[in-house]
Amino acid sequence: MSRKKWRSVVIVGLLASLTSALMLATTAGAAPKAGPTVIVGSKNFTEEYILGELYSQALKAAGFSVQYKQSIGATEVIDSALTSGKINVYPEYVGEIDQTVFHQKTLPQTAKGWWQLAVKLNKKRGITVLNPTPFFDVDAIAVRKADATKYGLHTVADLKKVPNASVGARPEFKDREEGFKGMQDVYGLTGMKYVSLDQGLTYQALDQKKVFCIDVFSTDPQLASGKYVVLKDPKLIFGVQNVAPEVSNKLLTALGSKAALLKSTLNKVDAKLTQKAILAMNSAVVNNKQTPKAVASAFLKANGLA
């Protein structure tokens, strides 16, 4: 064999050895596959953005492959996304499950009962409802403090005292029993005008007197300003609204032995979500202009969940 040919053989052999070594090193150093992707969804308002980030980041920290789809839409829209497989996890309000999704007319008298009903109803369609949060966030009707004093407003029914009153709320609130329809049917507010507004514009519309009252959430940080009065709902038309993760059973099956870890991770997050905690995070985003991602990250780290 000539020196030239011998050198070529040696070089080819060295290259082959080097390639094999690199392939082995790459394989050995590669992270193990995380299994099926967990697709977390959220609705289109601040509190849901925060909840979506909390779930997504906690699951990533636990080793899951996670995709987060923010601002999918209202209950009817995001529920459809869950049942169709476009997402497989999202935070939902228990009252929304019982009333908006399943249209239940006869409802339990306790928060635990509402959650148990949601678990039972969802089981029939292949969805698991995990543990509820300590905090609750119900729809409520708020008015300007000056108007509450002027008209002597204490309950939703008192709005009948106000001539030509209008309520501003998100579009889907209009036809719900736990919304404007319930206000008309239960409290007799048949003459009230409905003004459809984007959720983010309701307080602005109230401040500018474009509407007399608005639909709010009981954990809205704006309510701490003292500018508004939340009217009591003695008939409980707005229901019980603790939050619980809804998880597709198809995802749980695909995860196999890791399904238990997903459940425990989300349950640990929910267990930390007190009224004080969610109000602080909502305020950090709305008033302090922090991002939901940053707020969620700080909360998870402070509680040993990330």
Locate predicted features.
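Ligand-binding "clamshell"
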Residues: 101-111, 115-130, 208-210, 222-238
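Short, well-ordered beta-strand elements
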Residues: 34-48, 65-70, 163-169
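Short helix-initiation/N-cap motifs at beta->coil->alpha
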Residues: 68-80, 192-204
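A conserved helix-loop-strand patch within extracytoplasmic ligand-binding domains
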Residues: 111-167, 252, 271-275
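Periplasmic-binding protein-like
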Residues: 126-127, 133-140, 219-267
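C-terminal region of N-terminal signal peptides and the immediate post-cleavage residues
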Residues: 21-37
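Alpha-to-beta junction loops
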Residues: 83-92, 163-166, 182, 206-216
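Ligand-binding cleft/hinge of the Venus flytrap
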Residues: 55-62, 156-193
